[in-house]
Curated annotation (Swiss-Prot):
Residues 187-329 form the KARI C-terminal knotted domain. This is Ketol-acid reductoisomerase (NADP(+)). Pathway: Amino-acid biosynthesis; L-isoleucine biosynthesis; L-isoleucine from 2-oxobutanoate: step 2/4; Amino-acid biosynthesis; L-valine biosynthesis; L-valine from pyruvate: step 2/4. One of its GO terms (molecular function) is ketol-acid reductoisomerase activity.
């Protein structure tokens, strides 16, 4: 099996922040990603305006951090590069408010390609449309930058009206610290489809359902809920950390032979590959996107029901009680509050 990379990775030496030093960058949103992008760019010598609603609770925070703040339309009107860092669901409305401020040669930039790929935003042909996407929560983008490090990221060019879209995207990625760790070149389609599939089938959907099913199996069989929680949820972090640091083999080499043999011989029994293929197909053909767009237009009735069911699951109460009893719970709960939604 070849170990050669199939994608291009760029680092600091491949990018020059001065490429965008003569630009004004409007960062729309000041939540998890927005605050990190704005502050990191500002400290990299880039002229930044933060675009927020006048009643935004983040307005004062951004000003206190030394940033200039304007409404989105004003920020976009003064900017050469408009960076959409508000949630996907409100981006079309924000774009409608700022689209007349885009001039030929400007750049419309995203951190996720959902609205471009699925046609919710259709930019004019005379602007660059790009993506710079850190593969990390915003608070880590900021924290690692302050330490002189960075988080990996992606760049993509959807529309290159100026001929400079790629180099300027790399410059932006360097400005927020991503080229310190490495930036992969991809496409809007690939980023969106792999991201949605990963979230649904593995990272957010698959893992949580597997944890709940394991917890329920043990509790239904008469085992203590606290033991079920430790075995199926708490220890998951330990295993994922090993995989993150050393891949699957790094994990297998760190667990007992009994755990390794049991995992290798039984793990496949809990995986539904046909279900995974169906999830991917619904991402690729736009079925999931249409469902999610319609759900938002209907004020999220199903979404709210699913969230209520999660909140009321026994594993939540058991976990809350255990986290109050053990020191690691304080760190875990604090970590979940560090990344507010973009405003």
């Amino acid at each position: 099996m070849s170990d050669e990379l199939t994608t291009t990775v760029y680092y600091d030496e491949d990018a020059d922040v001065s490429t965008i030093n003569d630009e004004t960058v409007a960062v729309l949103g000041y939540g998890s990603q927005g605050h990190a992008h704005a502050l990191n760019l500002h400290e990299s010598g880039v002229d930044v305006i933060v675009g927020l609603r006048q009643d935004s609770s983040s307005w004062a925070d951004a000003e206190d951090a030394g940033l200039r703040v304007e409404t989105p339309d004003v920020a976009a009107g003064e900017a050469d590069r408009v960076v959409m860092l508000v949630p996907d669901t409100i981006q079309p409305a924000v774009y409608e408010a700022i689209e007349d401020e885009l001039d030929a040669g400007d750049t419309l930039q995203f951190a996720h390609g959902f609205n471009i790929h699925y046609g919710q935003i259709e930019p004019p042909e005379d602007v660059d449309v790009t993506m710079v996407a850190p593969k990390s929560p915003g608070h880590l983008v900021r924290r690692t930058y302050e330490r002189g490090e960075g988080t990996p990221g992606l760049i993509a060019v959807y529309q290159d009206a100026t001929g400079n879209a790629k180099q300027e995207s790399l410059a932006y990625a360097k400005g927020i610290g991503c080229t310190r760790a490495g930036v992969i070149e991809t496409s809007f389609q690939e980023e969106v489809e792999t991201d949605l599939f990963g979230e649904q089938a593995v990272l957010c959907g698959g893992v949580t359902e597997m944890v709940k099913a394991g917890f329920e199996t043990l509790v239904d069989a008469g085992y203590a809920p606290e033991m079920a929680y430790f075995e199926c949820l708490n220890e998951l972090k330990l295993i994922v950390d090993l995989m993150y640091e050393g891949g699957h083999m790094g994990m297998w080499n760190s667990v007992s032979d009994t755990a390794e043999y049991g995992g290798l011989t039984r793990g496949e029994e809990v995986i539904d590959r046909e279900g995974m293929e169906k999830i991917l197909e619904e991402v690729q053909n736009g079925e999931f996107a249409r469902e999610w767009i319609n759900e938002n237009q209907a004020n999220r009735p199903a979404y709210k029901q699913y969230r209520d069911a999660e909140q009321n699951h026994q594993i939540e109460a058991v976990g809350e009680n255990l986290r109050e009893l053990f020191a690691w719970g304080e760190d875990a709960d604090a970590e979940t509050t560090e990344a507010p939604a973009d405003d």
